[in-house]
Amino acid sequence: MMEENMTVYNINLGIGWASSGVEYAQSYRAQAFRNIDISAKFIFSDLILGNNIADLTANLGFDDDQIIWLYNFFTDIKIAPSTFLLDTFVKQNHLEQRNFILQPDNGMKELQYKSAKEKLTIVPRYNDREKGTIDQVTYVVNNQLIKRDFYSYTKYATEYYSGDTHDNHVVFREFYNGDGTIAYTQHLDGEGHELFEFPNQNYYSKTDLYREMLLKLNFKPDDIIILDRMDEDKQLVNGQLIFEHHLPAKLVIPVHADHYDKHYTNDHQVLWNNFYEYQFTHYRDVSAYVVATDRQRELLTSQQKHFNHAKPQINTIPVGSLEHLVKPEKPRKTHSLITASRLANEKHIDWVIEATVVAHKTVSDLTLDIYGEGGERSRLQDLITKNNADSYIKLMGQQDLKNVYQKYETYIAGSTSEGFGLSLMEAVGSGLSMIGFDVPYGNQTFIADQQNGYLLPYTEDWSNSRKEQLLAEAIVKNFTEADLASFHEKSYSLAESYLTKNVAKRWQQLIGELQHA
């Protein structure tokens, strides 16, 4: 039985519109915790002022009341969407009485109100034009930015600038309470030093402020702290603080990447991934490590034993999950391949294109659709055109793929390293057959060789043409010899354990164990 008032705190740093795997992992975890009624909080500590943080977190499916933001924590304003109206701002600041003139509106996010008498331009920024809501207002004097206000349902912060012509920078910021009083002031000296001034106390660094937040959170013995990201912010050593101040709560470390460098690891030494070195060497403070795949768990277990003579608890819990299995609404397109990833060099989509061109000579109605965006896009398009393959290989851009996979027969991956591979999980959840190399950890997790697809031998120093040849042979085999119906069934059965309800059970089990440890 879960303790009624326990909380799981998930520690992150920043969040943006385009998020990385860590934020997606947290978003899926939030779903799993909802499934089992566990109270979860997500702590962000970056200075996020470009957007209202509530817009960014809601975009990834978090509830506003799950968010703790360091800079908001010491105020009584809630994390909430931007509902403050432009009309309210204009009235409160008497812009009409002060003879401010609204400049011609260019349909952009920003409006300009100008007063010749006050030599001031006021620039409100729409959050949602149709609703008439704003999230920022900038004040400009003589073409110099002098201050900026930030709004959610009320004004929550203001930053003041030096106004220097050559080096205009923020001098201090005020963070407010709901009644408009100043909760605290952040002073900046331009050299990277900060001071946080409260009515009855000062904190002389962001690290001190963060420590104060941890103490005020007042962790209980049943609470759990999941440390997703640490020490990437130059002003903050949050990881060490959490190691020092997590008690009496239990500390859990998820591993979001390959955790060591195999090129520099042998029987005598291991080179840990530098994002995880601290967490692995301070294993005595860690109640459990969580990895996404059994394969990674086996490896980390043997390395901890060999190099640290340690036997820490390591659990496998997938970083992603499927709400439900997706069955095709109409028959899948015959001889169709799909791949989905960032269009980046390490995904080796060029190998997949070359392999498809070769296989197309045998399977004449073969098609490949490539989803995703990235820096390699134009190079990949050139490669398709050079091979006269525009009619059957297409770059499809960025799309929500939840209901797209089901239209295809087979998923193909060129990537040589996926920590987990969310797109692989989505593909088996839509019953596709799978083709990819036998590399850690994603392909080895989602491809059962000869059962739901082909897991191909791989050695780094083979030539590209050999790798492309292996992919091409697998494509041909998949569409000419394989029993695709049985491959599809096997993918669905493999996907079962990744259903949200089943992933939630694994969290439930881990949390239960930690509470009774």
Task: Label every model-predicted segment.
Residues 433-437:
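Short hydrophobic beta-strand element within catalytic cores of glycosyltransferases
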Residues 416:
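Aromatic "clamp/platform" in nucleotide-sugar-dependent glycosyltransferases that forms part
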Residues 389, 483-498:
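A short, well-ordered alpha-helix in the C-terminal region of glycosyltransferases
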Residues 473, 477, 497-517:
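C-terminal alpha-helical cap of glycosyltransferases
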Residues 379-398:
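Nucleotide-activated donor-binding/catalytic signature segment of Leloir-type glycosyltransferases, i.e.
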Residues 335, 342-358, 375-376:
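A conserved mid-protein helix/loop that constitutes part of the nucleotide-sugar donor-binding site
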Residues 272-277, 281-311:
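A short, active-site helix/loop in glycosyltransferases that binds the activated sugar's phosphate group
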